[in-house]
From Swiss-Prot:
Organism this protein belongs to: Simian immunodeficiency virus (isolate CPZ GAB1)
One annotated Gene Ontology cellular component of this protein: host extracellular space
Pfam families for this protein: VPR
Chief location of this protein within or outside the cell: virion
InterPro entries: RetroV_VpR/X (IPR000012)
Keyword Repeat applies: no
Chain intervals for the UniProt region annotation (Homooligomerization): 1-42
Protein name: Protein Vpr
Protein family membership: Belongs to the HIV-1 VPR protein family.
Record gene name: vpr
Signal sequence residues: none
Matches recorded under Gene3D superfamilies: 6.10.210.10, VpR/VpX protein, C-terminal domain
Described purpose of this protein according to its UniProt entry: During virus replication, may deplete host UNG protein, and incude G2-M cell cycle arrest. Acts by targeting specific host proteins for degradation by the 26S proteasome, through association with the cellular CUL4A-DDB1 E3 ligase complex by direct interaction with host VPRPB/DCAF-1. Cell cycle arrest reportedly occurs within hours of infection and is not blocked by antiviral agents, suggesting that it is initiated by the VPR carried into the virion. Additionally, VPR induces apoptosis in a cell cycle dependent manner suggesting that these two effects are mechanistically linked. During virus entry, plays a role in the transport of the viral pre-integration (PIC) complex to the host nucleus. This function is crucial for viral infection of non-dividing macrophages. May act directly at the nuclear pore complex, by binding nucleoporins phenylalanine-glycine (FG)-repeat regions.
PTM notes: Phosphorylated on several residues by host. These phosphorylations regulate VPR activity for the nuclear import of the HIV-1 pre-integration complex.
Amino acid sequence: MEQAPEDQGPPREPYQEWALETLEELKNEAVRHFPRPWLHQLGQFIYDTYGDTWVGVEAIIRILQHLLFIHFRLGCQHSRIGILPQRRRSNGSNRS
């Protein structure tokens, strides 16, 4: 009978510790790109919806990740990541 291999990798950090570190990193990045009152309202909404629970922590992590991804993708002025307008050819030809 087959058995799953034993875990031979390095021990993982606890999920809660990882989640709090990830949330802290996302918050630090978010305050560089979004207005603080807006982020405060987002945090208040999450707290009102989920209370002080791990589900709330997971929700705000997910929302901040999405917001930052979209922000960078649309062309954050602080980042090299983003959609750059295509340059038009000088001879008038245009590829579609």
